[in-house]
């Protein structure tokens, strides 16, 4: 597995990489890449940690599973590469950003620009078989990303957690609301966005909180 990851994350997660479950996960993922079509490409598996170093972390957004359509997943939750049509959840995210902050809907769905400002775009599971949703669930990724969230909760305060949907809310439950800003809403999926994602104003609320503790706002 090609582990391209910011050096501070590598140090923080080094013990996790040595645990038996992670070795088993690595073997499974290598075998999958060798025998099947897997997304994202291997060099992008840990891209969320490479684009958003731990020392720059301001916001955590938790997704569930990489996109399993051709050419979509790029290692950041909800994000797609330049030139790829926006999946429905990402369309809804951009509409809420526009309504909330007045920013125009961007031409690219590549969220590198968010990650580079300190937004960790973390899927709970970091790989998936082409066209098979949740096909890599239950193989150890969830344990690893739980450890990531735990490491943030233990080492950082003043973080904005955007928890969209019950899955993300369970995964982010360890974060202390007294020491951080916890923003909860339904998932931006078309199935649920109209039940409270639209109008949640998470993006402006995140920036208000960041500015209140002396941090620069995110240019959404």
Model-derived features with residue positions:
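Generic N-terminal amphipathic, Lys/Arg-enriched alpha-helix
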Residues: 1-13
């Amino acid at each position: 597995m090609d582990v391209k990851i910011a050096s501070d994350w590598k140090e923080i997660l080094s013990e996790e990489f040595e645990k038996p479950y992670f070795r088993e996960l690595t073997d499974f993922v290598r075998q999958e890449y060798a025998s099947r079509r897997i997304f994202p490409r291997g060099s992008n598996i840990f891209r969320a940690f490479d684009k958003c170093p731990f020392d720059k972390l301001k916001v955590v957004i938790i997704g569930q599973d990489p996109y399993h359509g051709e050419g979509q997943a790029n290692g950041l939750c909800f994000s797609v590469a330049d030139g790829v049509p926006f999946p429905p959840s990402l369309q809804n995210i951009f509409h809420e950003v526009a309504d909330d902050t007045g920013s125009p809907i961007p031409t690219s769905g590549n969220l590198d620009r968010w990650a580079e400002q300190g937004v960790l775009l973390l899927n709970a599971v970091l790989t998936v078989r082409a066209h098979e949703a949740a096909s890599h669930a239950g193989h150890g990724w969830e344990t690893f990303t739980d450890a990531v969230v735990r490491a943030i909760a233990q080492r950082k305060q003043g973080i904005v957690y955007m928890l969209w949907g019950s899955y993300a809310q369970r995964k982010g439950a360890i974060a202390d609301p007294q020491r951080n800003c916890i923003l909860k809403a339904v998932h931006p999926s078309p199935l649920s966005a109209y039940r409270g994602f639209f109008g949640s104003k998470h993006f402006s609320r995140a920036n208000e909180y960041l500015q209140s503790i002396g941090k620069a706002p995110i240019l959404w």
